[in-house]
């Protein structure tokens, strides 16, 4: 048993003693399992620290209590660990994937991703999962023997495949990737290190992915209430949240709205975690996987919402899309944020000398695609705050994003 390993694993869990290893071989740690080392490397990375000033929905300066990419990632990790513990999975690997899942996000949330994707359209586009892989495989410069974090194979496959297979066994893209193709960063990397894009990822990765959904649903409701984009009465339009609100009101008729909102978020998380756990138990009993590789060979994800809860969860996402993500206030700020990234990309492409010295290598290449990708990597690593400051340095007028 690896040093530092928690409770005994279920047979279908990823076993750190049987890890497929790292691209660059390293001697084992005397005090930590391979997956614990992965998690610690993510936590100590500069990319992880930068998440503190990256938008979840609201730009960092709009309020001190709104989620950022960092606080969101910590909340995803808490939910993921709880599920992993219940299912007998490796908590260290699960935590690694929960904390690493947003490392590739650019500043200004999904608006920033759309802006960079447009800027890089002629050069393979921008995909935050592919960018997370670039971060952990190349862009972090902390170790003398290798670029990136040199994570285990299991962590890398989880970062790339947590939402499911990208190809079939023949290598043909499936699902979303059938139309858009395999993101260039992933397609390039698997030539060096095969992540078996045709298979499902481990249960640890599947748990991290569904924990992300749960955290989004519950905590975006919390932030939306705090921002005044909607209120508790609006949330009664959905049967699940209406039932939780009604039960809370029955137990605590005089409770103020702030506490009722907090109780809604808490009960919603508990409800969704419980539903996922019950569905996972049912799926595991039906398929009887005896190893992590058995999990990868399945024809569907084993960690999922049951059908009725999946519809409840989809209704929450529809509500948030209409009342929060597409709210005119949010849309106005995100429109201005996209323009900031358009401006920065065009400026750096025309005048690479404006980049920091350490980023000039590659940005002055003769190949325009190489230059564009280098600039895209630089912008993707920016925080909201740095992007604003850099725009103010390079341009006469910069929106304040308020």
UniProtKB/Swiss-Prot annotation:
SUPFAM superfamilies: HD-domain/PDEase-like. One of its GO terms (molecular function) is dGTPase activity. Transmembrane segments: none annotated. The keyword Hydrolase applies. It comes from the Bacteria. The keyword Hydrolase applies. InterPro entries: dGTPase, dGTPase-like, dNTPase_2, HD/PDEase_dom, HD_domain, PHydrolase_assoc_dom. Residues 69-217 form the HD domain. SMART domains: HDc (SM00471). Keywords: Hydrolase. GO terms for biological process: dGTP catabolic process. Gene3D superfamilies: Hypothetical protein af1432 (1.10.3210.10). It holds the Pfam family HD. HAMAP family: dGTPase_type2. Belongs to the dGTPase family. Type 2 subfamily. This is Deoxyguanosinetriphosphate triphosphohydrolase-like protein.
